[in-house]
Amino acid sequence: MADLEAANINHDNHLLLDQPCLRLPYELLRKNFRSVHYPFEWDSTSVKNVVKETANGLISGKASPQDAVENLDQMLVKMRGLKRKLTAAAKEEDRLYRQMDSRVAHLRELADLHTVDDVRYEAWSRQRLDRLLVDYMLRHGYDSSAIALADERGMRDLVDIDTFVVMSRIRKSLEGGSVQEALNWCNENKKELRKMQSNLEFLLRCQQYIEMMRTDSPAKMAEAIHHARKYITPFTETYPVEISSIAGLLAYRPGTISEPYASLYSASRWQKLADTFVEAHLKLLGLPMTPLLHIALSSGLSALKTPACHSTQLQVPTQPEESQPVNGAGDGAATATAAAASSTTSTAIPHHHHGTASLTTRVCPICSTELNALARSVRYAHHGKSRLLEQDLVLLPNGRVYGKARLDEYAAKSGLPAGQIKDLVTGEVFSGEEGRKVFVT
């Protein structure tokens, strides 16, 4: 019964992971609408006013026919410009709707699946893995590789290449020491950033001021003061401490060791600006800061993680393959005890191998070099049900648990007198009366 439940697909959990897949096109549709809504309202009102003024001027005789023609020409220029904006917005809207249709269809395929044993589930999960890999590469700046994978798998509409390419370009410009593209982005999203209470624009303006102060040119210093009055002073009530610090740069030149001025001149601020931009960009679009691939891996890592996985120096016994303690699923405490207690016949290595099995076949995934750091911050899994690998469990005085049949069999193989039992790992010998029966609830 438990195996059948484990094979069932939990659609709610899948949708939690795939939520950004649907959220981003929706957020981009809203942004696309806002980008043309205000220009449309502004230009429409302007054209109506010009038409009204021209008509009234002709009727009253205050405007000549030549003036009317010039006004009409101006209206035509505005309307043509508005038409170009609306056409571009309509194309973008069609693209986003196409993406949403593809993503809904992709998730609908999952809704039609009920167990992981379905042959269609493997193909679907493989496509999702490819999508998560593309997301990971885009977040880390591997744009060419991400685009190549998306094109090879034919899933352009399932990933957000254009959005992340723009983010990557602006991030690289900040890392290269330029704030202009980031400021343009802030200007496009000024209202949303203000609602988020983001300090990105303030930090960018401060960096412009710092770069002006970095030179010894009196003209540049005068320009920096003018820049501060225009762009930084409006933030006085919000960031008084920061503004006081950057004002002190007038007295402290580059190369100073006095803090906080030395940190303000530090080149590492560019990387901090890039990180702040990425954080604001993802938050604006409702995307998680952690790559979706890490989120997906974390659930599996949590199921496998035990308290012994991040011990700095654990002992791995050199007992034969058959000498393994009984570890049920999720029995992290028993595993940790087993690893720690095996000090008499063991070899010290950096990572443990859960259950003291063969060093070549029983390597814990959590202890692998690739996943150990990622799993460090993952919580231990909650196991609501116990699964017994052996019946009639016996607790030895040293805290280890084994099946009674295996203890008796191992005692016989070891040639022990009747009534004695031997720990399969440590080799400790106990009286059979010292073992306590274990009842798992």
Curated annotation (Swiss-Prot):
<dbReference type="Pfam" id="PF10607">
    <property type="entry name" value="CTLH"/>
</dbReference>
<comment type="function">
    <text>Involved in the proteasome-dependent degradation of fructose-1,6-bisphosphatase.</text>
</comment>
<feature type="domain" description="CTLH">
    <location>
        <begin position="163"/>
        <end position="220"/>
    </location>
</feature>
<dbReference type="GO" id="GO:0034657">
    <property type="term" value="C:GID complex"/>
</dbReference>
<dbReference type="InterPro" id="IPR013144">
    <property type="entry name" value="CRA_dom"/>
</dbReference>
<comment type="similarity">
    <text>Belongs to the FYV10 family.</text>
</comment>
<feature type="region of interest" description="Disordered">
    <location>
        <begin position="312"/>
        <end position="354"/>
    </location>
</feature>
<dbReference type="InterPro" id="IPR044063">
    <property type="entry name" value="ZF_RING_GID"/>
</dbReference>
<dbReference type="InterPro" id="IPR006595">
    <property type="entry name" value="CTLH_C"/>
</dbReference>
<protein>
    <recommendedName>
        <fullName>Protein FYV10</fullName>
    </recommendedName>
</protein>
<feature type="compositionally biased region" description="Low complexity">
    <location>
        <begin position="333"/>
        <end position="348"/>
    </location>
</feature>
<feature type="zinc finger region" description="RING-Gid-type">
    <location>
        <begin position="364"/>
        <end position="426"/>
    </location>
</feature>
<keyword id="KW-0863">Zinc-finger</keyword>
<dbReference type="GO" id="GO:0005634">
    <property type="term" value="C:nucleus"/>
</dbReference>
<keyword id="KW-0479">Metal-binding</keyword>
<dbReference type="InterPro" id="IPR024964">
    <property type="entry name" value="CTLH/CRA"/>
</dbReference>
<dbReference type="GO" id="GO:0045721">
    <property type="term" value="P:negative regulation of gluconeogenesis"/>
</dbReference>
<keyword id="KW-0862">Zinc</keyword>
<dbReference type="GO" id="GO:0008270">
    <property type="term" value="F:zinc ion binding"/>
</dbReference>
<dbReference type="GO" id="GO:0005737">
    <property type="term" value="C:cytoplasm"/>
</dbReference>
<keyword id="KW-0963">Cytoplasm</keyword>
<feature type="domain" description="LisH">
    <location>
        <begin position="125"/>
        <end position="157"/>
    </location>
</feature>
<dbReference type="GO" id="GO:0043161">
    <property type="term" value="P:proteasome-mediated ubiquitin-dependent protein catabolic process"/>
</dbReference>
<dbReference type="GO" id="GO:0061630">
    <property type="term" value="F:ubiquitin protein ligase activity"/>
</dbReference>
<dbReference type="InterPro" id="IPR045098">
    <property type="entry name" value="Fyv10_fam"/>
</dbReference>
<dbReference type="InterPro" id="IPR006594">
    <property type="entry name" value="LisH"/>
</dbReference>
<keyword id="KW-0539">Nucleus</keyword>
<feature type="compositionally biased region" description="Polar residues">
    <location>
        <begin position="312"/>
        <end position="326"/>
    </location>
</feature>
